């Protein structure tokens, strides 16, 4: 007979991954072998990606904020060899769109921080919406062209750029960001009346706290890009459909009228069967 892990233990392992634990720490706490946990996370993560792709459609969002957060695969970009680029090693950015009202993440994409990935991300976002939106982003140079290509003139889009002070050479900041001296808001398309990325920047913090592969100074980073994408998909499925948000007092999927009740971790596992 095949040695199949009971659904309760699978749910425990997946929940631990979704709450910021590394694979090896889950192994120590549950006694499940790390290779089994890895395969489970990939399988459930891929199923979650397919589920969200089909479920998050015709969304009635009003204010969307987009941003990208940095991570890396196997090694940081400065350590990469020319041949590493084709295999997906080095820096990876996760582009995230957040509905400022419901806190739903309707679209996300992991890849290089370049024009191609930005275009794919905005195209995907546009295809999930049913109405005109207010869209805000930072000043990343590829956003303006990507928004124009995806939305045309059917969007109210603005950029917010934060200007930072030059750090004093004697200042011991360690990992703290430099001081913000000015914030510039610029309308790009249409008539955006509220340009802000505050909520999506807070969402970046949530991702780093709940997805161990993206934690600051982590030693639990991904070794393969495909595994990283599966972990990110698992996180956002848990965030959108399972975890209660304290501000809105329900899951983001419920707030956006995508679901009428929260899902359980066991439901995510069932999708992968």
Region locations from a protein language model:
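Residue-level recognition of single "structural anchor" positions
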Residues: 1-273
């Amino acid at each position: 007979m095949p040695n199949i892990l009971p659904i309760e233990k699978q749910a425990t392992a997946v929940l631990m991954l979704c709450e910021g634990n590394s694979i090896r720490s889950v192994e120590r706490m549950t006694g499940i072998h790390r290779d089994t946990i890895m395969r489970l996370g990939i399988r459930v993560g891929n199923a979650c990606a397919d589920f969200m792709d089909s479920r998050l459609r015709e969304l009635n969002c009003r204010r969307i904020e987009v941003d990208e957060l940095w991570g890396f695969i196997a090694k940081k970009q400065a350590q990469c060899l020319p041949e590493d680029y084709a295999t997906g090693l080095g820096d990876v950015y996760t582009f995230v769109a957040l509905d400022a009202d419901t806190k739903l993440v309707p679209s996300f994409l992991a890849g290089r921080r370049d024009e191609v990935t930005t275009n794919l991300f905005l195209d995907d976002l546009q295809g999930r919406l049913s109405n005109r939106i207010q869209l805000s982003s930072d000043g990343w140079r590829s956003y303006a062209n990507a928004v124009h290509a995806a939305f045309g003139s059917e969007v109210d889009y603005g950029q917010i750029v934060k200007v930072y002070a030059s750090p004093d050479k004697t200042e011991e900041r360690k990992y703290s960001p430099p001081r913000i001296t000015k914030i510039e808001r610029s309308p790009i398309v249409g008539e955006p009346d509220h340009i802000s990325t505050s909520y999506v920047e807070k969402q970046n913090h949530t991702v780093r706290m709940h997805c161990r592969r993206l934690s600051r100074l982590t030693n639990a980073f991904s070794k393969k890009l495909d595994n990283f994408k599966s972990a990110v998909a698992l996180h956002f499925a848990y965030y959108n459909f399972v975890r209660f948000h304290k501000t809105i007092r329900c899951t983001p999927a419920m707030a956006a009228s995508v679901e009428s009740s929260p899902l359980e971790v066991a439901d995510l596992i069932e999708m992968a069967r």
